Amino acid sequence: MSFLCGSASTSNKPIERKIVILGDGACGKTSLLNVFTRGYFPEVYEPTVFENYIHDIFVDSKHITLSLWDTAGQEEFDRLRSLSYSDTQCIMLCFSIDSRDSLENVQNKWVGEITDHCEGVKLVLVALKCDLRNNENESNAITPNNIQQDNSVSNDNGNNINSTSNGKNLISYEEGLAMAKKIGALRYLECSAKLNKGVNEAFTEAARVALTAGPVATEVKSDSGSSCTIM
C-alpha cells in the first residue's frame, strides 16, 4: 500500500465547510436553522447557548457537508461564543427587521468581534422575520443580492421596492442592503423562517461564499523535513 500526498481521489467525498450563524439574541437565528435542517418552525422561543448542526446540500452540482454553528447573542456568552470562530469559512451575520438595535449591532458589535477572532472571514448579511412586512411588494423581495455584481433593488415585477412599515418601524430592504455594503458583506439576503421563504436560498448562497474561501489547511512536516498540506 502506498500513499501519495495530495493525489488521492476525493471525487466521492463531500466538500466540508463551516458556517457560523451570528447576531443578537432573539433575532431568529435558531428558528432559521431549525427550518433549514429539521423542517419545522419552533413556536416557543428558547435561548440557545451553543448548538452545532450538520447538513448536506448540493450547490452547483457539488456535494457539500455544512457544519452550522448556532451561537448565543447575549453578552454574557461572549467568551463561550469566541470558541466557535476557529476554522470558519463564512459567517452568516443576522439581524431582525423589527429590531433596529440588531441592525446597528451588526456594525457596532459583531463586525468588531469577527475582526478580533477571525479577521478576513467572508460575510453574508441576512435579514430575518421578513414575514412581518405585510406589503405584497416587500414579500416578493425575499431574494439574494450579490452585492459585488448587482446593486439594483427590484421586485419580481421589475418595480423598485418601496419600504413599508405599516405603522411599525420595520427595517427596509434598502437599509439592510446599505449595511451589507458598509461592512463588506459578499451577499445580502432576506428570509422568513416562519413562512419558509428564502431559507434554502440563504444557506445556498452562504455555501457558495464558503466555497470561495477554500478549505482550512494544516501543514504537517514529515521526518524527512518535507511538508504535506492536510485539507
UniProtKB/Swiss-Prot annotation:
Its main location: membrane. The keyword tRNA processing does not apply. One of its GO terms (molecular function) is GTPase activity. A lipid is attached at C228 (S-farnesyl cysteine). One of its GO terms (cellular component) is plasma membrane. PANTHER family: RHO FAMILY GTPASE. It holds the Pfam family Ras. Present with 5910 molecules/cell in log phase SD medium. The modification Cysteine methyl ester is found at C228. SMART domains: RAB, RAN, RAS, RHO. It comes from Saccharomyces cerevisiae (strain ATCC 204508 / S288c). It is found in: Cell membrane. This is GTP-binding protein RHO3.
